[in-house]
Design a protein with these regions (language model features):
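Vicinal oxygen chelate
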Residues: 1-7, 91-142, 167-184, 191-194, ...
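N-terminal beta-strand motif that seeds the catalytic metal site of vicinal oxygen chelate
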Residues: 1-22, 73-78, 124-155, 203-205, ...
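Short, recurring structural edge motifs at helix starts
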Residues: 1-3, 15, 62-65, 194
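Core segments of cupin and vicinal oxygen chelate
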Residues: 6-8, 12-55, 92, 100-108, ...
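Short amphipathic alpha-helices within nucleic acid-binding modules
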Residues: 24, 82-89, 212-218
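Long compositionally biased, domain-poor regions of proteins
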Residues: 30, 160-161, 185-191, 195, ...
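Active-site-adjacent scaffolding segments
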Residues: 39-135
Length: 258
């Protein structure tokens, strides 16, 4: 559906940092049908990815000076009405400031942050650009999910920073929390067990599709990898965790009844 504004705390933008900008553009265009609008930015190659002319997110080339420090990865932005106030809340709650704050021309103001476990996220204060103009439809972001080793600590942190409510889900055998903004679920949180190995806490982005299995097969055909094969979530839909050719991890989900 089309979006004209975001409530503070809602996911509002997704962004891929990649070491293969051209390859990423080809891969995601073939996978989701996204069109790419290249933009000139000092020191980096940058593209907006769009659906029928509506901005959904961005893909950018990791600068050479950051090659050793930044892996190919998807990042999520949450809306805020004041970036600087949000930074202060993050620091007070035990998080860290990773980068910024920066004004992005007349579009808005942003900062990259990390929670107490190191899971990174960004915040966006809209001026002229609200963020993604579509959500909850095929090809668009529909869900974000925090994998945490300390759910109680994460719960306290994000509720203090964004004012989210948390609802325990009854649709899973494992403990699962749904994050609520003004009563609407926009994401979730699960606990990382020993089976996760040394993987650090992180945010996972889910893009909606009509056919999970078809997209998983397409990822492999395009040179990517299936990390978690298509799996049913009772009462919700069918999802898969995927890896693009440069190592960017993301998920797709075909929602029940969609």
């Amino acid at each position: 559906m089309r979006v004209t504004e975001y409530i503070p705390g809602q996911p509002c933008w997704s962004e891929l940092a990649t070491h293969d900008w051209q390859g990423a553009k080809r891969f995601y265009h073939a996978l989701f049908g996204w069109d790419m609008a290249d933009m000139a930015l000092p020191g980096s190659a940058f593209s907006m990815f769009t659906l029928d002319g509506d901005d959904l997110g961005a893909i950018y080339q990791v600068p050479d000076v950051a090659v050793d420090n930044l892996k190919t990865q998807w990042g999520i932005y949450f809306a805020t009405d004041n970036v600087d106030t949000t930074i202060a809340r993050v620091l007070e709650a035990g998080g860290t400031l990773v980068m910024g704050p920066h004004d992005i021309g007349h579009a808005g103001r942003m900062a990259q942050l990390a929670d107490p476990e190191g899971a990174r996220f960004a915040v966006w204060e809209c001026k002229r650009h609200i963020g993604a103009k579509r959500r909850h439809e095929p090809g668009a972001l529909c869900w974000v999910e925090l994998a945490s080793r300390s759910p109680a600590r994460a719960h306290q942190f994000y509720c203090e920073v964004f004012g989210w409510d948390c609802r325990e889900s009854s649709n899973s055998e494992m403990r699962y929390c749904e994050w609520l903004v003004s009563g609407e679920a926009h994401g979730g949180m699960l606990e990382m067990t020993a089976e996760w190995g040394e993987m650090p806490p992180h945010w996972m982005l889910y893009f909606q599709v009509l056919d999970c299995d078809e997209h998983a097969a397409r990822v492999e055909a395009l040179g990517g990898r299936v990390c978690v094969p298509p799996t049913d979530i009772p009462g919700v839909g069918r999802f898969a965790v995927l890896n693009d050719p440069d190592g960017g991890i993301f998920s797709v989900i075909a929602l029940r009844g969609s």
